[in-house]
Amino acid sequence: MTSPQPTETADVVLVGAGIMSATLATLLNDLQPEWRMLVLERLDAAGLESSNAWNNAGTGHSALCELNYAPQAADGTVSAEKALTINEQFQVTRQMWSSLVENGTLEDPNTFINPVPHVSMVFGDDHADYLRARYDAFKPNKLFERMEFTEDRDLIAQWAPLTMHGRGAGRVAATFAPEGTDVDFGALTNQLLNHLQGRNITVEYGQEVTTLDRQSDGSWLVSVVDRLNSDNNRVIRAGFVFLGAGGGALPLLQKSKIKEAKGYGGFPVSGLFLRNTDPTVTAQHNAKVYGQASVGAPPMSVPHLDTRYVNGRRAIMFGPYGGFKPNFLKHGSLLDLPKSVRAHNLYPMTRAGMANLDLVKYLVGELTKTRSQRIDALHEYYPTAEESQWELIEAGQRVQVMKSDPQKGGVLQFGTELVTSADGSIGALLGASPGASTAVPIMLNLLSKCFPAKMSEWEPRIKELIPAYGRKLNDDPRLTDEIMGHTASVLGIK
């Protein structure tokens, strides 16, 4: 079969105009400004899928309050290691954002990031004992030194007033991290891409990538359908391709036919949130309050009562309530999941599914919940919430990674996964949380995998953007104070 003839060329093609592509394009444009890059988005604007503010929790994932990053072991101990890794990654992201604010790439930081304390709150003896053990494991670390723990109801009421209004008897425990943030990744994505337009980078909308053909010289022929005018369909020859299309990355990765893609599948999980925009309510809550996920529930289902800042307005979200649709994207197709099944991933997906029947049971239970049951769940965190003040909204799709495993046959993986070809000519990002908050370190990892010969040349400039690049802040208290103090000052956070 002959390959289609290219009508134009680009050094880099990035598929999907979300936070990942925007971050990678920003890095590459700074490191190689002469490279011609194209960002291709199938929808009519940037950041409309998982990067959109209402399609994610905007937590600024730094493992300050998300309890699933530090589960309790069978012997009762809690390790801070995974949480430290995530926090270190977020500090890398913060450093780059600070540099981009300073050089004018990003606008006033309060248009995309705001200080919102992160709170963990649990109920009952077992959960309270766990939270204390978690606090004891976290507190000695430099990155978590500002964390506080209490079971004092009056103090918790100061941290998160709505959670204690009308609360009945029973043990309550909470931790408080004042350095927490809320991030509008949709606004951030748009600012990055708007700045890049015209700087040897073109961002095009309504453009759907349909096929990827690898050439003998290592380049790729990228077939693009113009969704508004088929007369403009074209083929682009690209030296490097990045698939940053969220849930849409997996089908495109499969079309690339690289051997590294074999064994990968995806399991889509949808989510619903209750949202309150009444100023009389939102003014009383300035915290992200995270609880414990129910048994069998996926990590992204951890209940949380979240302060959000979107377009300068304050709101509160509660959720998520899990759901299932076979779409890989919110604006995707019901055929996404069945069409992704291949001979090479059928067994891993089957094995992963059999090992996660609790998840299936959880999703079935979530799908059958009534509105009153959802309000009951809200009342666990905001006892006096009035049902009439809350609207139900649909969040973005999260396509969890399913992949082959030598011991188990197949596993369901919560998190992100970078898949790159051996020659470094194509890379794809699969998975979900913590995702956007760790976009910068993930994209730096992609650069090291796909452009290893360039890293020594790029390193001095990377260190200008990210002063502590290559170093762990938690191991160097003085460096931590210097870096976190500077980024907090530039970004207007605590």
From Swiss-Prot:
Belongs to the MQO family. One of its GO terms (biological process) is tricarboxylic acid cycle. It comes from the Bacteria. InterPro entries: FAD/NAD-bd_sf, MQO. Its cofactor is FAD. HAMAP family: MQO. Its EC number is 1.1.5.4. Keywords: FAD, Flavoprotein, Oxidoreductase, Tricarboxylic acid cycle. It is an enzyme of class 1 (oxidoreductase). It catalyses: (S)-malate + a quinone = a quinol + oxaloacetate. Disulfide bonds: none annotated. Pathway: Carbohydrate metabolism; tricarboxylic acid cycle; oxaloacetate from (S)-malate (quinone route): step 1/1. Signal peptide: none annotated. GO terms for molecular function: 2-hydroxyglutarate dehydrogenase activity; L-malate dehydrogenase (quinone) activity. The keyword Oxidoreductase applies. It comes from Kocuria rhizophila (strain ATCC 9341 / DSM 348 / NBRC 103217 / DC2201). This is Probable malate:quinone oxidoreductase. It holds the Pfam family Mqo.
